[in-house]
Amino acid sequence: MPELPEVETVRRGLAPAMVGARVARVTLRRPNLRFPFPERFAERLEGTTVLELARRAKYLTAHLDSGESLILHLGMSGRFDVRLPDGSNLSPGDFYLEGALGTPKHDHVVMAFANGATVTYNDARRFGFMDLVATRDLETCRHFASMGVEPLSDALDAPRLARLFARKITPLKAALLDQRLIAGLGNIYVCEALHRSGLHPALPAGALAKPDGSPAPKAKTLVKEIKAVLTEAVAAGGSTLRDYARPDGERGAFQHGFRVYDRVGHACPTKGCTGRIGRIVQGGRSTFFCETCQVLPVR
């Protein structure tokens, strides 16, 4: 599933084609994706102009001049193909590039714009979805109401992290992946941020808060590294594993800078560390970390 940097990369690729453009026609080639389309979905989109294309965690939101916002979630394999007015093509979020995945038979939604551009949503697995909600109700809608703080926003700082994690015995990695606390973090970038911070993924999350609720020293370090990892990943166009490419069709490059993710047995890249990267399973997901410089304190 694409994480925050990949979704932000898709947003940046779609924005030039969509923002300021009027939706002329919407074609639905099936009645549903993961969920049924909203009532009168195509009718409510047609004739509207896209004022802004934003991102909330791992969701895209297109704010329309009708007072509604289109919410888009890519699921596991969602991608967009864009045909620009000049006839050129982009693939902002080109997932599953080989075989049947990503072929035209999985083109489920086609949006034609008055400027001649066409945006096609393709989703082989159909885990993605689209919804329409009143823009004024966006933050309280069912998709976002319980969502936590944005990790790249100024709202996430060491005191906020300490308040979120205070007295929690949940493993630190699980707490970071809890979208009700911090929205948008995924497995890859949590593993990377924890390694840079020198924190064991199984450390109780509450260890980042002092008894009085103020941040422990490592809380500031972790916040800094979360923001650094995400910022670097966005700049690199996301991470390509087997299914992701940048808006221009090129592969994302951040995977070349992975320190621990999917690097079991490799030497730890931390200067002076002689350890190797290990793997454990937490919550059904692989966790990668250095067995030497990310030590779980003995209690």
From Swiss-Prot:
Binds 1 zinc ion per subunit. The keyword Hydrolase applies. Gene3D superfamilies: 1.10.8.50, MutM-like, N-terminal (3.20.190.10). A zinc finger (FPG-type) spans 259-295. InterPro entries: DNA_glyclase/AP_lyase_DNA-bd (IPR015886), Formamido-pyr_DNA_Glyclase (IPR020629), FPG_cat (IPR012319), MutM-like_N-ter (IPR035937), Ribosomal_uS13-like_H2TH (IPR010979), Znf_DNA_glyclase/AP_lyase (IPR000214). Its cofactor is Zn(2+). GO terms for molecular function: 8-oxo-7,8-dihydroguanine DNA N-glycosylase activity; class I DNA-(apurinic or apyrimidinic site) endonuclease activity; damaged DNA binding; zinc ion binding. It comes from the Bacteria. PROSITE patterns: FPG_CAT, ZF_FPG_2. GO terms for biological process: base-excision repair. It catalyses: Hydrolysis of DNA containing ring-opened 7-methylguanine residues, releasing 2,6-diamino-4-hydroxy-5-(N-methyl)formamidopyrimidine; 2'-deoxyribonucleotide-(2'-deoxyribose 5'-phosphate)-2'-deoxyribonucleotide-DNA = a 3'-end 2'-deoxyribonucleotide-(2,3-dehydro-2,3-deoxyribose 5'-phosphate)-DNA + a 5'-end 5'-phospho-2'-deoxyribonucleoside-DNA + H(+). The keyword Hydrolase applies. DNA binds at H106, R125, K168. SMART domains: Fapy_DNA_glyco (SM00898), H2TH (SM01232). Its EC number is 3.2.2.23, 4.2.99.18. Keywords: DNA damage, DNA repair, DNA-binding, Glycosidase, Hydrolase, Lyase, Metal-binding, Multifunctional enzyme, Zinc, Zinc-finger. The active site is at P2, E3, K58, R285. Involved in base excision repair of DNA damaged by oxidation or by mutagenic agents. Acts as a DNA glycosylase that recognizes and removes damaged bases. Has a preference for oxidized purines, such as 7,8-dihydro-8-oxoguanine (8-oxoG). Has AP (apurinic/apyrimidinic) lyase activity and introduces nicks in the DNA strand. Cleaves the DNA backbone by beta-delta elimination to generate a single-strand break at the site of the removed base with both 3'- and 5'-phosphates. Monomer. Belongs to the FPG family. This is Formamidopyrimidine-DNA glycosylase. The gene is mutM.
